[in-house]
């Protein structure tokens, strides 16, 4: 049997189009809205922004950055010509959702040199004997990318910005995640990444 609606107004779907009698100037915070609004698709902008983590992995000369919110995950692919994730890293304080497509999200990792490129984990674990320099990274970029491509341009830009690098501090073990919050050893939240306490 068809459901009868117990209201004289018919079935009203959304409230966005209609005039509200005394619409408040200041809107209540989300937790005060009752019952909780049901959306038909996830609204990226409004997801609680402390439920957030970011990881990157490499696949066939592409860096794949995964931003993971509470329930949904979203991926960005950034084409780089070279295959070693060891040359790239994400600094603290650069990423908001809007800045994601910018290349200066990434910096090259090493600053000093004996002209050989170390592995990043080695460096963090304190097992490093040499430290690397821009020249090495530049050589790596040039040897792994085709000339006159955006990849090479991007790679060389990263190498130029190399002194802007940032290291996560703290105990790093062989299988710890690439980005770590420096006091707790967990992956950082968006506030920590953006420099808020």
Curated annotation (Swiss-Prot):
It comes from the Viruses. It is found in: Host cytoplasm; Virion. Keywords: Host cytoplasm, Virion. GO terms for cellular component: host cell cytoplasm; virion component. Pfam families: Lenti_VIF_2. The keyword Mitochondrion does not apply. InterPro entries: Lenti_VIF_2. The keyword Cell inner membrane does not apply. Signal peptide: none annotated. Residues 10-22 have a biased composition (Basic residues). Residues 1-22 are annotated as: Disordered. Determines virus infectivity. Belongs to the lentiviruses Vif protein family. This is Virion infectivity factor. It comes from Jembrana disease virus.
């Amino acid at each position: 049997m068809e459901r009868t609606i117990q209201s004289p107004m018919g079935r009203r779907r959304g409230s966005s189009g209609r005039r509200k009698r005394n619409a408040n100037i200041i809107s209540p915070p989300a937790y005060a809205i009752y019952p909780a609004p049901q959306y038909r698709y996830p609204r990226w902008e409004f997801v609680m922004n402390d439920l957030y983590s970011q990881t990157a992995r490499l696949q066939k000369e592409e860096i794949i950055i995964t931003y993971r919110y509470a329930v949904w995950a979203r991926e960005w692919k950034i084409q780089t010509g070279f295959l070693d994730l060891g040359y790239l890293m994400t600094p603290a304080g650069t990423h908001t959702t809007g800045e994601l497509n910018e290349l200066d999200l990434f910096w090259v990792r090493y600053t000093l040199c004996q002209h050989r490129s170390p592995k990043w984990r080695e460096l963090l674990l304190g097992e490093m004997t040499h430290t690397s320099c821009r020249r090495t990274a530049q050589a790596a970029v040039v040897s792994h990318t085709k000339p006159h491509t955006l990849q090479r341009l991007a790679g060389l830009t990263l190498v130029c910005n190399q002194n802007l690098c940032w290291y996560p501090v703290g105990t790093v073990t062989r299988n710890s995640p690439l980005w770590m919050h420096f006091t707790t050893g967990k992956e950082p939240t968006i506030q920590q990444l953006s420099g808020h306490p």
